[in-house]
Amino acid sequence: MPRLGALIRGHLRELRGQLRYRLGLVLQRLIGRRHTATRLDPGQIRSVLIARINGRLGNTLFLTPMIERLHALLPDARIDLALSYPHAATLLGGMPGVRQVILFPHKGRDLIPKYLRALRRLRATHYDLAIDPTPFSTSGRLILSLAHARFRLGFSLPSQWAAHTHAIPLPAATMHQGRQPAYLVATALGAAWDPTALRLWLPLRPDEVAAGRAAVATAIDAVGAGLAPGRPVVGYFAHATGLKRLPPAWWARFWQALLALHPEVVAVEFLPAAAAAPTVPGFARLHLPAQRQLTAAISTLRMFICADAGPMHLASTTDTPTVGLFQATDPALYGPLKAVDRSIAVADLTPEAVAAQVSVAF
């Protein structure tokens, strides 16, 4: 039944996307096609607004390559982020170049008053450039249209109705969702485009990394595993949701096979809640309530293995090799991004076959 529910939700999302596209076509015809330019003058931009009104952790982190690129191309510009991921301010507020995070509501009570308060805060500032970084977001188009901005940048497509001054055509080839916003900015500013150099970006302070290392060591000590010098620590997160989830029996077989290949490995399971049930009894386990804490702990590991979920994207911001396990979504669009990361489509593989592939990456 859970898989049936997830399948139904997937079809509903697809239906919403089709309706959103058709509505965009209607609005575009009513409003009329506008003339847009494709090239921005960096010398005219001192303030930037990025609008991504989406409550998911992964979609929020997919903005970080663009933020890094913007800061490199416009080092003196202040960047404001209009986001709706609930922990966005803590997660991204201290990034180089970012001045503030304007948080729009995602769920819960009093949505309209909270939305209007965030909108007033956004409209209190006049920006040189406002960016809608994704091609099909109705909320992004709305925020872009309501912002006080001299220039408005987004993607050009038939259903686009927002009041853009500058628009870039979608790339012909499929592009990872973490690369697409950076491509938009690089193209508009006339900068070199090297997609292989991009990665998710979440700078950590040394004290955060030290605390993460201590948390991992404490979790290992709690089960009496000990951590002899040279023993690699491999973390994993198994609690994905819906069709992305792999059952505990799958993880038990996977770890039995991987430890047979690498008996020196110390496994640590990262849990979504302190009371969550572990998938493999006897392993060290760790719950860290804040995303930056979780990221810092992952940054100290030899490898991190994750079903397609938010912690996979957090892990990909670190130097730790990250293995994403996919069975419901396209890793070409959503997989971990840096060069040492790897995505494995597991739907038609046994846990033992997946362990063999992870062993090669290890």
Q: Where are the language model's segments positioned?
A:
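Catalytic machinery of carbohydrate-active enzymes
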Residues: 1-362
